[in-house]
């Protein structure tokens, strides 16, 4: 089990690396996180919802994502409450205080999922959440040491040196644990190091002396480009290098599934920016409204900050606008919430009015994987595979964006404004290339200047890069010994 000294210490990516390494070494591996809080989610083949971090880890392990890998998913819908999803199904909205009172009732679900995975796989790589030393939360812990005790898991504790104070992080965390919890920690890991590791060696020796725990490795700041489901992801902060095409994605307050746009970020001609103000928006070559966990609140925010008027003005001038899921709903004429499902109280709002659609929210959530062929003129014929996660039902009076495999029309297009419910639409190389070519033609750029990108190949390369970086800087023999396993001789450890 990998636990961290804080959120953002690198647990998710370290778990992905270990999944990849163990799979490369010939083991059947599965990831597991008992409780995940995230806005980015995924729909499995059987229509169940789980966090994307475990999806990435499953891909690293070479196995299909399975809801057992993340039995509890919390999707924040406000500053004080979340939608609670158990075994892929929505249990309802809960204020944080209520969830904390009731979460121990979910232990049977957690153990059933874990034990079922343990029957099917050789190694389970468990990810903790936040820090195990949050002393105000320890009594009801089901995701850090509380879980480690339930499943009798050895623990690796990782600290983030890039933020500074890593020795205090690790020592303080260990000191705040109970003796039986400290005994579960088999080794310490320093993550995200930049520079000469020799400078750290005196500190490492002192840390080992004070904690009575070995340091298993110092992992460098790896530049592997792996999906990050954290809503505070650096991906939303960094402005891409200047490229011929400028795509502005609105960073909504409750933005979700922004991993949809990772393929665009990798395109050699597309510069992707995440914007929050009219000044940042400027005059891009296209505007994208992403998914959101709270369409109503984010539509009101869009209106209040002036972005609604700015986007509408750009659309009237012919700038392409794309809405995905909640962003698609916002582009329509009206959004009705008769039961208060989305906003907490019955109301009807006007949308941006850029598409001839009306959306009504209902309690039942649609979750499905879909294959489709795009029918919208600029991208007609492009094949894509995606997934839907939404409560709104949208009535369309215009032309569809695409046709699903069963012949059902999906989404809407009017002029240069496009809307679809399909997450993951740009994972299809066909649509990504046609989208870029469309923008190139509008700007007089030769689209042939860019070589096609296979996101599947790119993700594989990045996962291998991540695994290689960890393999070369972690004492894998010690990691295997902590699990009571012998390190496979054929690969060994290159440290």
Feature locations, PLM:
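Conserved P-loop NTPase catalytic core
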Residues: 341-368
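Conserved catalytic-site region of short-chain dehydrogenase/reductase
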Residues: 330
């Amino acid at each position: 089990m990998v636990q961290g000294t804080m959120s953002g210490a690198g647990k998710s990516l370290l778990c992905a690396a270990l999944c990849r390494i163990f799979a490369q070494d010939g083991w059947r591996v599965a990831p597991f996180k008992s409780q995940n809080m995230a806005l980015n989610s995924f729909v499995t083949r059987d229509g169940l919802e789980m966090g994307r971090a475990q999806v990435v880890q499953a891909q690293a392990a070479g196995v299909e994502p399975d809801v057992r890998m993340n039995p509890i998913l919390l999707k924040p819908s406000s500053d004080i409450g979340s939608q609670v999803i158990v075994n892929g199904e929505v249990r309802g909205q809960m204020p944080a205080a209520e969830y904390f009172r009731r979460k121990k009732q979910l232990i049977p679900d957690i153990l059933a999922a874990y034990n079922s995975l343990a029957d099917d796989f050789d190694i389970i790589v468990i990810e903790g959440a936040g820090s195990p030393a949050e002393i105000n939360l320890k009594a009801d812990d089901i995701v850090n040491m509380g879980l480690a005790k339930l499943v009798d898991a050895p623990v690796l504790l990782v600290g983030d040196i890039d933020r500074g104070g890593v020795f205090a992080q690790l020592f303080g965390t260990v000191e705040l644990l109970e003796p039986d919890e400290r005994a579960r920690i088999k080794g310490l890991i320093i993550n995200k190091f930049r520079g000469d590791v020799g400078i750290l060696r005196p500190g490492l020796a002192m840390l080992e002396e004070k904690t009575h725990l070995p340091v298993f490795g110092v992992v460098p700041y790896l530049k592997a480009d792996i999906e990050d489901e954290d809503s505070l992801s650096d991906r939303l902060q960094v402005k891409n290098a200047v490229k011929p095409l400028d795509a502005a994605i609105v960073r909504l307050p409750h933005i979700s599934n922004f991993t949809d746009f990772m393929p665009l970020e990798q395109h050699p001609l597309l510069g992707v920016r995440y914007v929050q103000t009219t000044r940042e928006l400027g005059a891009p070559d296209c505007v994208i409204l992403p998914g959101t966990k709270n369409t109503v609140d984010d539509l009101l925010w869009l209106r209040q900050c002036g972005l609604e008027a700015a986007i509408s003005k750009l659309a009237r001038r012919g700038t392409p606008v794309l809405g995905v899921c909640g962003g698609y709903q916002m582009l329509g004429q009206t959004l009705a919430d008769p039961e208060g499902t989305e906003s907490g109280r019955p109301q009807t709002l006007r949308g941006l009015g850029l598409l001839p659609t009306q959306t009504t929210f209902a309690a039942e959530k649609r979750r499905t994987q879909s294959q489709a062929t795009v029918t919208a003129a600029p991208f007609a014929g492009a094949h894509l595979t995606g997934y839907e996660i939404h409560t709104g039902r949208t009535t369309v009076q215009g032309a569809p964006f695409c046709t699903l495999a069963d012949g059902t029309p999906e989404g809407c297009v009017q002029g240069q404004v496009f809307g679809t419910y399909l997450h993951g639409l740009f994972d299809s190389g066909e649509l990504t290339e046609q989208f870029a070519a469309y923008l190139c033609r509008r700007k007089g750029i030769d689209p042939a200047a860019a070589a096609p990108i296979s996101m599947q190949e790119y993700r594989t390369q990045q996962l291998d890069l991540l695994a290689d970086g960890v393999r070369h800087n972690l004492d894998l023999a010690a990691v295997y010994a902590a699990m009571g396993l012998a390190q496979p001789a054929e690969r060994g450890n290159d440290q």
